[in-house]
Amino acid sequence: MANKLTAVIVVALAVAFMVNLDYANCSPAIASSYDAMEICIENCAQCKKMFGPWFEGSLCAESCIKARGKDIPECESFASISPFLNKL
């Protein structure tokens, strides 16, 4: 009888836990500390991979260091990466 009661409690707790997973909305970057300069430089590297020789990755990284990560480039936003694009 005790085993059945324990099994029912475990199943009920598992169901309650799974139901509450949907309500847990948090961003890992906000839940833990993050370094804006690190994200900025990583985005520069990602844009360099995407655009290849048309993107000045070193210039982008230098601007991250000078601005201390305040202006993070987004590869899909032309306005944020236009200073780092070249015509070849």
UniProtKB/Swiss-Prot annotation:
GO CC terms on record?
A: extracellular region
Top-rank taxon, per record: Eukaryota
Q: From which residue to which does the signal peptide run?
A: 1-26
Cysteines joined through disulfide linkages: C40-C64, C44-C60, C47-C75
Q: Which GO terms describe its biological process?
A: ecdysis, chitin-based cuticle; neuropeptide signaling pathway
Q: Where in the cell does this protein reside?
A: Secreted
Q: What Gene Ontology molecular-function terms does this entry list?
A: ecdysis-triggering hormone activity
Keyword annotations from UniProtKB, A to Z = Disulfide bond, Hormone, Neuropeptide, Secreted, Signal
InterPro entries, alphabetically?
Eclosion
Any one Pfam family here would be Eclosion
| Biological role | Neuropeptide that triggers the performance of ecdysis behaviors at the end of a molt. It triggers adult behavior patterns: larval, pupal and adult ecdysis, and plasticization during the molt.
The UniProt similarity line reads: Belongs to the insect eclosion hormone family.
Q: What is this protein called?
A: Eclosion hormone
